[in-house]
């Protein structure tokens, strides 16, 4: 069986996070995933609150854009969480949305170099190494953490394009694949990831829209705008956007198809006004 996670959507009220996290844990999920989009909430503080509100589940950051923080600061923040909550943190890193990075004046000259150099520097710092880097984008001169964690968190990347997927296979512990991608896209992504040198231990994490509803017309009213927007981003018709939208009886079969394609963790992103009942229904159908 895969790991089953749940996303705390960026549009939910921050005050609801801890109750949401506790409910997800009680419902039997393996993970809670948080996001970081410009103007919403910071991922490190969100992850800290989620970890504090739970006792068992893994909390994933999906993702922290690497141009926003020095690798040293990022490692310091992650080390603190990993020490206090050993074995319960996954650090997802990515390029960040180019438009947002330009808004903030932090867009790197080389996105690939920025991501690779950050992943390697952060991993070294979390190991307790004395890290010196003079790369294309990252520059550190003899930095070491005073309190490195005993259990190092996995570092995964949320990336899309072939060269970035190969980079993830080369340097990361896993790869996050965005909503709307199904079994065929998973297999295509894995081809690039493995070309980068990924082993069987590389964790493939897929975000998937969830809306349990037996009425297709009603489901379309709730989810249509989100699906259409993602279809536009992916460059496909809305009908080709993979999702867990529909009758709950279809959820196990769709999840099985993702696992057979190579997915190790499926993160449910519930759509609609009542996310927790949606999550409970899906987890129950999956035998949780």
Regions found by a protein language model. Give the residues of each.
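Active-site-adjacent structural elements that line small-molecule/cofactor binding pockets in enzymes
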Residues: 1-288
